[in-house]
Regions:
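C-terminal substrate-recognition/cap domain of FAD-linked oxidoreductases
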Residues: 11-31, 62-86, 292-491, 499
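Extended, charge-enriched "interface" segments that sit outside catalytic cores
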Residues: 1-48
Length: 551
């Protein structure tokens, strides 16, 4: 049971989940077999020069400076499985020495000047949701490390309804942006899975993608201008125009910069009227291949809805296992009748069928037209409408996945997600190749039970798709399971690249994938990036070290 009340699964009994996990992984998962967390683990001491503190106190209040152990620990990691395992069971070798909470752009620029004067390194912090080791501190770093938590810079500075733009501070969290804009009848439309906790600055720094990009675009489509505090001063412009041809666009340097070039302080973004209609939907397909062909035709022949996702059979079963305890009576009867119709009348095989979940947004006319086109194309590929409620539930489950992952770690199960983008012609083979490679490698190492390997197509483009993988296994008896997992994930990443996929669609590079950069870009490209870093930040004030850009 997930505690609290924020999520749809909160407070609900899930009687089928652990038995399903036990059967699927072929492992000894039960309430008496628990790996008890040791949080908080050993916390490294803080080392801050008195002179640096004295300089900070000239422009910051005492409640903007925090050296407490747990605060520093929380700012020293993201959400990779390795980081979660470390804070639960071992330790992080290096964490920030101090956390600073600026409340104005002037304080950010003053902080950078003080950091330069006292040879201190700065790591920007948004929501802490990254899964690339982007926040992990280098254990070799001898300088004082400052985590710059931007979340107090969270204001919407202005809204222009006539030109449909808004200026927002970089520390604003996604759910707060949505709530504030809604008061004015508008939305930004950017909803990554981490929207509850991630920030506008983090979205830009990681070049993020949202689940509704089909309607609103990815972050690079939404941001019109960005203001950045750098080691040399402020990067800003006088206006935000619809489009410009003014030479090299320095704003674009910040997309995917991952904290290595400066601190994003605000951005001007596009906004949209709140949709007149929002509807969910879902479609069942007899096989993953049939569902994939449907998505291909949908991208070619129609306007895809705000979001469309296709999950494979194992992920479909995972969702069924998370259904709450039934109230009995008519609910049970309805469920049995639906299962009978799908498997007996329609002939769908339980261990081959897959599901597609949908979100439609727009005017009533737009949504009606999209639904008509989509369900017509789905029927051509053997698809069967499965109702709005199943679609809504599928998207709500998105927000609980991280908690389920962390819950399962207590039962000796380690798991993580990784993603890629790939042309249509290589996508199906890539899915199969990655699943086969991981399964074979797992067996070769004689690890316990069976691995959990599943995939979903989570974004569609005219030229290809984004594919999201989940991988996990039972780790009891495996020494250093987080390292074993990382080795296997790197093997999966190797197979992704061999199969024509990208290094990342929206998670980014961080430190987790920097070793793969020579596989995807030329030596000249890498040297240009390093040269840019040395030119803009010669003293490596922004010392996150992501992408190998460490001065």
């Amino acid at each position: 049971m997930i505690r609290g009340s924020r999520y749809e699964l909160s407070g609900k009994e899930l009687p089928r989940f652990l038995p399903w996990v036990r059967e699927m992984l072929e492992c000894d998962v039960h309430p008496g077999n628990v790996h008890q967390p040791q949080y908080p683990t050993s916390i490294p001491e803080s080392h801050v020069q008195p002179e640096f503190f004295a300089a900070l106190e000239k422009f910051l209040r005492s409640n903007q400076i925090d050296t407490s152990g747990e605060t520093r620990l929380r700012h020293g990691h993201g959400h990779t499985q390795e980081e979660m395992y470390s804070i639960k069971y071992t330790r992080l070798g290096r964490i920030p020495d101090v956390v600073i909470y600026p409340e104005a752009e002037s304080q950010v620029t003053s902080l950078i000047e003080v950091a330069k004067a006292h040879n201190v390194t700065l790591i920007p912090y948004g929501g802490g949701t990254n899964v690339t080791d982007a926040l992990r501190c280098d254990e070799r770093e001898q300088r004082t490390i400052v985590s710059v938590d931007m979340r107090r810079m969270n204001r919407i500075l202005w809204i222009d309804r006539e030109n449909m733009m808004a200026a927002i501070e970089a520390g604003a969290v996604g759910r707060h942006i949505m709530a504030e804009l809604r008061k004015h009848g508008v939305t930004m439309g950017h909803e990554p899975d981490s929207v509850e906790f991630s920030t506008l600055g983090g979205w830009i720094a990681t070049n993020a993608s949202g689940m509704k990009k089909n309607r609103y675009g990815n972050i690079e489509d939404l941001v019109l201008d960005v203001t950045v505090a750098t080691a040399d001063g402020k990067l800003e412009r006088t206006s935000a125009s619809p489009r410009e041809s003014v030479g090299l666009d320095l704003r674009r340097l910040m997309f995917g910069s991952e904290g290595t070039l400066g601190i994003i302080t605000s951005a001007v973004v596009k906004i949209f009227p709140l949709p007149e209609v929002q509807r969910y939907g879902s479609v069942l397909f007899p096989t993953f291949e049939a569902g994939f062909k449907f998505m291909y035709d949908l991208a070619r022949e129609a306007t895809p809805p705000a979001s469309v996702r296709l999950v494979d059979n194992l992920q479909f079963q995972f969702g069924l296992a998370l259904k709450p305890k039934s109230s009995g009576g008519l609910a049970d009867l309805k469920s049995k009748a639906e299962k009978f119709f799908v498997t007996r009348i329609k002939g769908f095989e339980p261990f081959k069928m897959v599901a597609c979940t949908l979100v439609f947004e727009g005017t009533r006319g737009e949504v009606t037209r999209q639904e008509s086109d989509l369900y017509r194309i789905a029927a051509r590929h053997g698809g069967m409408k499965a109702g709005a409620e199943n679609g809504r539930r599928g998207y709500q489950l998105t927000y609980s996945i991280a908690y389920i992952r962390d819950f399962l770690m207590n039962y000796y199960i380690i798991a993580e997600s990784f993603e890629t983008s790939v042309p249509w012609t290589s996508a199906l083979a890539l899915c199969e190749n990655v699943k086969r490679r991981l399964t074979d490698e797992y067996a070769r190492r004689r690890l316990p039970g069976k691995p959990f390997v599943t995939a979903r197509v989570t974004q569609v483009y005219r030229t290809g798709v984004c594919i999201y993988f989940y991988f996990g296994f039972y780790y009891k008896g495996i020494p250093n399971p987080q390292e074993v997992y990382l080795e296997l994930e790197n093997i999966a990443r190797d197979e992704i690249l061999n199969s024509g996929g990208s290094l990342s669609h929206h998670h980014g590079v961080g430190k987790l994938r920097r070793a793969f950069l020579p596989r995807i870009m030329s030596d000249t490209a890498i040297q240009w990036k390093r040269g840019l870093k040395k030119s803009l930040d010669p003293r490596n004030v922004f010392g996150a070290g992501n992408q190998g850009l460490d001065g």
